[in-house]
């Protein structure tokens, strides 16, 4: 799946609130940096942490709460 499609699906999960999505991605990236395991099987090696976080949100594996 292309990153544009993943971003569109992730935006759907947060009711098209780009600010909320960016906050959720940043929070998940910090969790990954601090040792959390990805919740998805990586479709390609060497994915960036932001791509992993966005894909997890798009798949509904990470719940996003309003800030």
From Swiss-Prot:
The keyword Nucleotidyltransferase applies. This is DNA-directed RNA polymerase subunit omega. Coiled coil: none annotated. One of its GO terms (biological process) is DNA-templated transcription. One of its GO terms (molecular function) is DNA binding. InterPro entries: DNA-dir_RNA_pol_omega, Pol_omega/Rpo6/RPB6, RPB6/omega-like_sf. Keywords: DNA-directed RNA polymerase, Nucleotidyltransferase, Transcription, Transferase. Transmembrane segments: none annotated. Its EC number is 2.7.7.6. It comes from the Bacteria. Promotes RNA polymerase assembly. Latches the N- and C-terminal regions of the beta' subunit thereby facilitating its interaction with the beta and alpha subunits. Belongs to the RNA polymerase subunit omega family. GO terms for cellular component: DNA-directed RNA polymerase complex. The keyword Glycosyltransferase does not apply. It catalyses: RNA(n) + a ribonucleoside 5'-triphosphate = RNA(n+1) + diphosphate. It is an enzyme of class 2 (transferase). The RNAP catalytic core consists of 2 alpha, 1 beta, 1 beta' and 1 omega subunit. When a sigma factor is associated with the core the holoenzyme is formed, which can initiate transcription. NCBIfam families: PRK00392.6-2.
């Amino acid at each position: 799946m292309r990153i544009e499609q993943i971003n569109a699906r992730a935006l759907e999960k947060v009711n098209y609130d780009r600010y909320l999505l960016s906050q959720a991605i940043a929070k998940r990236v910090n969790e990954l940096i601090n040792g959390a395991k990805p919740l998805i099987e990586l479709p390609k090696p060497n994915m960036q942490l932001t791509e992993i976080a966005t894909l997890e949100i798009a798949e509904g594996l990470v719940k996003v709460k309003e800030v």
